[in-house]
Amino acid sequence: MLHHKFVYPFLFKWHLSCVEKCPPQITFIAKYATANDKNGNRKLTIRDEQWPELADPTPYDIFGIPKAGSGNPKLDKKSLKKKYHRYVKLYHPDHSDNIQIFSSEKVTNSDSKSPLLLTSSEKLHRFKVISQAYDILCDPKKKIVYDTTRQGWTTSYSPRSNVNTENYQYAGSYGYHSNAQYEYWNAGTWEDANSMKNERIQENINPWTVIGIICGLAICIEGTALLAKIQESLSKAEFTHDESGLHLIQSYTNYGLDTDKFSRLRRFLWFRTWGLYKSKEDLDREAKINEEMIRKLKAAK
C-alpha cells in the first residue's frame, strides 16, 4: 500500500515535468465518434471538414487551393498529393464502407437517431469527383485546358441526387479505375465487354468527321479519274505521232515493195480496191482489172 501511495504520485509528477520540457509534436488531432449501423456493427462517424460546402465545387475548391489574382493558381504538388491521399482514405470504396461521414450540412448532435450521413453511392460519387479533380490538377495539359476553356471537368457535383446517371460518368480517374475500365473488368461475358467497346466507339464518332471522310474519299476518287484521263490523252497523242511517222517511212519505202513508178501505182490500186470491196470475188475481179490497166500503161510507154 505504501508503494502505491508514494511511488505512483512521484512518477506522475516526474512525467508531467518531462512533458512540459519536451512537448510532443502533434500534427493532427481528430475526435471521432462511433455509431452502430443497421447490423449492429460499430463504425467511425466523422465530419469531413476539408470538403467544400459549395453546391458545385471546382477542382480548386475540392483541394482548398485559393485562386491567385492572375486566374492561374499556384499548386504545391506535395500538399496536393497529401490531401488526395487523405480523401482516398475516407472515400475509397475499400474504406468508405467502414466509415460514416456527415454530409456538408452542419450537424449539431451526432447521437441523433437520423444523422445526415452520406450514403454509399454519395461517397463513391465524391471519390470519383476527387479523382477527376486530382487528375486535372496533376496533368499540366489538362489543367491549362480547364483554366482556359473550363473543359475536362464533366462531373458536376450535386449532393443528395441520383449519382448513378450518365452525367456523372467520366474517364481517366487517377489512382483508381475509371468508369470505362470498371465496366470492362466487371462485364459478365466477352460479349458484354465487346458491346461496351462498340458503344464507346459509336459515342466517339462525330458526324462532321464522317462527312469529312466521305468528302475526302470523293476528292481522291475524282482526282484519280482526272489523272487517268490526262495520262490517257498524253498516251494517245504520243501514239498518233509515232503512228504517223511510221506510215510516212513506209510510204517512202513503198511498204516493202519495189519503189518504181508502176509498183507504187499497183500498191495504190490495191489499197483502193481493199477499201472499196470486201468479198473475195470482188477483190479478184478488181485485181484483174488493175493488172490490165497497168499492162496498158506499160505498153503505152
From Swiss-Prot:
<keyword id="KW-0143">Chaperone</keyword>
<protein>
    <recommendedName>
        <fullName>J domain-containing protein 1</fullName>
    </recommendedName>
</protein>
<dbReference type="InterPro" id="IPR050817">
    <property type="entry name" value="DjlA_DnaK_co-chaperone"/>
</dbReference>
<keyword id="KW-0496">Mitochondrion</keyword>
<feature type="transmembrane region" description="Helical">
    <location>
        <begin position="208"/>
        <end position="228"/>
    </location>
</feature>
<dbReference type="InterPro" id="IPR001623">
    <property type="entry name" value="DnaJ_domain"/>
</dbReference>
<keyword id="KW-0472">Membrane</keyword>
<dbReference type="GO" id="GO:0005743">
    <property type="term" value="C:mitochondrial inner membrane"/>
</dbReference>
<dbReference type="GO" id="GO:0005739">
    <property type="term" value="C:mitochondrion"/>
</dbReference>
<keyword id="KW-0812">Transmembrane</keyword>
<comment type="function">
    <text>Probable chaperone.</text>
</comment>
<feature type="domain" description="J">
    <location>
        <begin position="58"/>
        <end position="150"/>
    </location>
</feature>
<keyword id="KW-1133">Transmembrane helix</keyword>
<dbReference type="InterPro" id="IPR036869">
    <property type="entry name" value="J_dom_sf"/>
</dbReference>
<comment type="similarity">
    <text>Belongs to the DnaJ family.</text>
</comment>
<dbReference type="InterPro" id="IPR018253">
    <property type="entry name" value="DnaJ_domain_CS"/>
</dbReference>
